[in-house]
UniProtKB/Swiss-Prot annotation:
Keyword Metal-binding: yes
Lineage: Eukaryota, Fungi, Dikarya, Ascomycota, Pezizomycotina
GO cellular component terms given for this protein: nucleus
Pfam families (UniProt xref): Zn_clus
Keywords from the UniProt entry: DNA-binding, Metal-binding, Nucleus, Transcription, Transcription regulation, Zinc
DNA-binding region: 23-53
Knocked-out gene: effects: Strongly diminishes the production of asperlin.
Top-rank taxon, per record: Eukaryota
Location relative to the cell: Nucleus
Biased composition (Polar residues): 75-85
GO molecular function annotation: DNA binding; DNA-binding transcription factor activity, RNA polymerase II-specific; zinc ion binding
SMART domains xref list: GAL4
Organism: Emericella nidulans (strain FGSC A4 / ATCC 38163 / CBS 112.46 / NRRL 194 / M139)
Protein name, per record: Transcriptional regulator alnR
Length: 407
């Protein structure tokens, strides 16, 4: 008799094993045939995705989740065994150990007694974490929710629980993130930002000696940020400013480089070196605008007149031979000294030497900053700044050569 029972038990186990799902989780979810190769099936290898086998899950479609109406209570046509099982589960939950009851002491009493399911329609066993958490997020992200700062003095959860109630000791202890209110007004910056049409002013009392400027309180770094903001807002690439504005910005940058080179704290700052390289590149680009326009005008005049001709002079009353009825090209970049705009005759006397002198002074300062950046070749920030500064120096040498070709 025992032999018959053992054979039947083995046959039942074999039958149960046959009913267990043998395909991987990915193929089961996609409802496709699985090759059942381990450690990875053919489909998972082809799609380059992880292949996970869960042999304890039975084959067939998963059971349907009960509707909210069925969660309110047992139906009238339930069998006696189901009612008995539910009563057993309830008695088991009520007779839990003291540690579990201590952990559940912070939860609302309606969750433990079953009134929570009757009032909200949510199963406290299956969906207390999922559905309540989703509804909690939906209510907290709305502007009228009680979880945002400044909206209510006594915030509440979506289910009407008071967050200051003694039944909930730490409402945000389980959430490792903070929900901010994007509708709140942003506080104004305390620091003064100069107008965009005004150059940032350097403090006159600043010294270039490292002993006096050893601890500048980040004033040099603030000046770099202000000047970068000035170049970004006032001198966009779409509009080319006048020569005097460019020269004024170039002189201010050289004074700023002197200040940073004399401050050991700011000179050793990685961010300061990177800001200096960005500002220098911008100034070199603006100087290129002047020389590029002048060079193009000279080239066009040479093409028209077939001889070297300076485009900085005022056009004569009579047009040259071969240009009858055509207007000569002149430099349209304005040059102002104070509030007085110089004419074409006054420009040609000193503009060439003036620009050459400024290019030489700027190249010397940029070369000093580059030598400082090469002291840390292993630092990626210093390496990037050194490459930008090297390109700026090369560009300044090219501009000096182009400017010397002027007549």
């Amino acid at each position: 008799m025992s032999t018959v029972n053992q054979s039947s038990t083995r046959s039942e186990l074999a039958g149960n094993w046959e009913r267990l799902r043998k395909s991987c989780d990915t193929c089961q979810e996609a409802k496709v045939k699985c090759s059942q190769h381990k450690p990875s099936c053919h489909r998972c290898l082809r799609h380059r995705q992880p292949c996970v086998y869960s042999p304890q899950r039975r084959s067939g479609r998963p059971p349907k989740r009960p509707s909210p109406s069925s969660r309110l209570g047992p139906e009238s046509n339930n069998s006696g065994d189901d009612i008995h099982n539910e009563n057993t589960i309830q008695r088991t939950n009520l007779n839990a150990n003291d540690s579990a009851m201590t952990d559940a002491g912070a939860v609302d009493p309606r969750v433990l007694t079953g009134d929570f399911a009757a009032s909200t329609g949510i199963d406290p066993v299956d969906d207390i974490f999922q559905t309540s958490f989703e509804s909690f997020l939906a209510a907290s992200l709305s502007p009228k929710g009680g979880l945002l700062p400044g909206s209510h003095s006594n915030p509440t959860t979506p289910n009407g629980f008071s967050m200051n109630s003694p039944s909930i000791t730490d409402p945000f202890g389980a959430f490792p993130f903070l929900i901010t209110d994007h509708n709140l007004p942003i506080a104004a910056l305390s620091s003064h930002v100069p107008p965009i049409d005004q150059l940032p002013v350097l403090s006159t009392g600043a010294s270039n000696t490292s002993s006096e400027c050893g601890d500048c309180g980040a004033k040099c770094y603030s000046s770099l940020l202000q000047h970068l903001l000035f170049l970004r807002q006032t001198l966009p690439e779409s509009t080319r400013p006048s020569i005097d504005v460019i020269m004024q910005a170039e002189g201010h940058v050289r004074a700023l480089l002197d200040r940073v080179l004399g401050c050991n704290a700011c000179l050793g700052n990685r961010s300061s070196i990177l800001l200096i390289s960005a500002i220098t590149e911008r100034i070199v680009q603006m100087l290129d605008w002047i020389i590029e326009e002048k060079t193009l005008l000279d080239t066009e005049n040479m093409r028209y007149n077939r001889r070297t001709f300076s485009s900085w002079g005022r056009p004569p009353r009579l047009p040259p031979h071969g240009l009858n009825g055509m207007r000569r090209n002149v430099c349209h970049v304005s040059l102002r000294v104070g509030n007085t705009e110089l004419d074409e005759d006054a420009k040609q006397y000193f503009l060439k030497n003036f620009i050459l002198l400024r290019l030489k002074k700027l190249a010397v300062k940029v070369q000093e900053v580059r030598r400082t950046a090469t002291t840390r070749p292993g630092d990626c920030i210093y390496r990037a700044a050194e490459l930008v500064l090297a390109d700026s120096i090369q560009r300044l040498d090219y501009l000096r050569g182009q400017c010397q070709l002027w007549e």
